[in-house]
């Protein structure tokens, strides 16, 4: 009897762990979640970060506080792995400097990130936010961040 009770207890514990891990992802996206944005550096407007991003060193060579800048592959892997984000098709495809910024987002987590690509194969994260919904016009995220 003790062995059966022990198995039931372990099964119950495993089930509660799985459920507790799934709950944040389920609760992260709400249709009424307001869109909010934060610059990569507190107190620095996002449009200023976008301008500076083209000349910042990659993060492992940075001397002080700055946005996360790294090889494109590293940025992409970080956004995919840590935040379940992927590029949003059609966002940032115009010709102005602000419009070359890439929008990455996650339906699962409800998060989004603005990435400033550079000609040397590196990129900088200039802003991030919450409230992503694939049904919204992508311009909402750029506008909320202070671009466009």
Please give the residue ranges for each predicted region.
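Polybasic/polar functional segments that serve as interface/processing modules
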Residues: 2-111, 115-148
């Amino acid at each position: 009897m003790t062995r059966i009770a022990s198995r039931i207890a372990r099964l119950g514990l495993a089930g509660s762990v799985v459920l507790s891990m799934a709950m944040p992802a389920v609760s992260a996206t709400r249709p009424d979640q307001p869109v909010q944005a934060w610059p990569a550096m507190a107190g620095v407007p996002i449009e200023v970060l976008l301008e500076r991003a083209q000349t910042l060193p990659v993060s492992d060579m940075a001397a002080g506080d700055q946005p996360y800048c790294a090889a494109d592959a590293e940025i992409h892997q970080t956004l995919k792995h840590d935040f379940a984000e992927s590029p949003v098709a059609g966002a940032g495809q115009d010709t102005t400097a602000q419009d070359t910024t890439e929008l990455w987002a996650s339906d699962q987590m409800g998060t989004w990130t603005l990435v400033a690509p550079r000609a040397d194969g590196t990129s900088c994260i200039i802003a991030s936010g919450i409230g992503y919904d694939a049904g919204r016009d992508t311009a909402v995220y750029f506008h909320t961040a202070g671009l466009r």
